[in-house]
Amino acid sequence: KPIHADVVMTDPENVAERQLHEVFRKKLTSSDVSRQQDRLLMAKERRGCLGKHNTPSPENRDVNVDMWDECDGRKYSFVHGLWTSNGSYVLKGKWRSFCDFKCLNVGDTIVISMDDSDGTIWIRHERATIELTRRSNTSSMLYAASL
């Protein structure tokens, strides 16, 4: 079953024309990309970052949230949930499938932004980079490689 809708909302080039502001950023941890878990842990301090209509509460612990990919314009449907045991928020639903589809790894970064003009929520990922240092007798060189 596909993890995204077959409908493309917009041409990805048009994303640059939108007035997006970042509401959430996280460097992925091993538990965020774990095969045993299907969730992105969001700090409880980020309550409301996806807008008041998309925020879980003790009465409504799971809220369906559609997000649009900044890279390809596709819609992804997740569930924004509340863990009442510790008050943390999670993005779940098809999170594991999203990680697999995007080949996300520990150290990659997820960025969620909102368009205030129409309330759409946008998601993108940034690949982690590693720095390799090569030392020789006379010089030191620094390389950046994309994972």
Positions of the model-derived regions?
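Acidic, low-complexity intrinsically disordered regions
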Residues: K1-L147
